[in-house]
Amino acid sequence: MSRLDSMIRRLLAQRACLEAVAEMIEDLPGPVLEIGLGNGRTYDHLRERLPERTILVFDRVLAAHPDCIPPLDTFFLGELETTLPLAYKRIGATAVLAHADIGSGRGDHDSANAALLARLLPPMLRARALVVSDQQLHCAELKPEALPEGIPTGRYFLYRCIK
């Protein structure tokens, strides 16, 4: 499969997962975490799809399209091992949804980031919160959920927090 085809399939899976979880969290309060702003496409989609939610955004560098830059009071710039604990101090265990797009295509790097996220993310999540991730997360508090129909296993990952 070409890299273009792979990217298209990944983006289709991402959108399908985000659409599914948006409906699943309708009756649950709490902010949304967008981990990995990148150029801001997913953040833009989330703020359009979930306009009533506060969206906290995390990235190492700010490289988003100017129309997709979050407000400064919701943007955490820096490494996840620093920024996620800062956000936890602010919101506690209230996040209802976390979307993580942290893959780089470099296996060892991605595995290390996924392990870090699996350790730091669950304390920030409320019971029954959902996590959508481009990386597999191994954590006792995150139970794998079924992906939307048509999304192949391993293309994207969906979890529910079972506190």
Where would I find each of the regions flagged by the language model?
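Class I SAM-dependent methyltransferase Rossmann-like catalytic core
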Residues: 1-30
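A generic alpha-to-beta junction signature in SAM-dependent methyltransferases
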Residues: 26, 50, 91-92, 124-125
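Glycine-rich SAM-binding Motif I of class I
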Residues: 40-44
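Conserved SAM-binding motif I beta-strand of class I
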Residues: 53-59
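S-adenosyl-L-methionine
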Residues: 61-92
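Short SAM/SAH-binding signature in class I
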Residues: 93-103
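C-terminal substrate-binding/active-site "lid" region of AdoMet-derived donor-dependent transferases
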Residues: 104-163
